[in-house]
């Protein structure tokens, strides 16, 4: 496993910040699955009251690809939720 490219991490942070501006929280859990030899990230989006909006789990052996997958999902969720009241 190599080092995470800083541009991918910056894009991930920018995607989470867009959701924070909508008063939503992004909860991030990560672990390594030794059986499948993949890094795993579970993302949950909740409102400030703790009500679950959506959740998704991502698996990949490459951290850059994993963070790109998470960033794409967060941006997609932002596009869906920005007009939601």
Swiss-Prot record:
Pfam families: T7-like_gp12 (PF10922). InterPro entries: Phage_T7-like_1.2. GO terms for biological process: DNA replication. Keywords: DNA replication, Early protein, Host-virus interaction. Plays a role in increasing the intracellular pool of dGTP. Interacts with and inhibits host dGTPase/dgt. The complex made of the host dGTPase and gene 1.2 protein creates a GTP-binding site of high affinity. Subsequent binding of GTP to the enzyme-inhibitor complex inhibits its dissociation. Interacts with host dGTPase/dgt. This is Inhibitor of dGTPase.
């Amino acid at each position: 496993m190599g080092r995470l490219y800083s541009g991918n991490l910056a894009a991930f942070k920018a995607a989470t910040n867009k959701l924070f501006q909508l008063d939503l929280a992004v909860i991030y859990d990560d672990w390594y699955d030794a059986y499948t030899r993949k890094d795993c990230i579970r993302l949950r989006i909740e409102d400030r009251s703790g009500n679950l909006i959506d959740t998704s789990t991502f698996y990949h052996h490459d951290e850059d690809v994993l963070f790109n997958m998470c960033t794409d999902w967060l941006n997609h969720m932002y596009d869906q939720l920005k007009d939601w009241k």
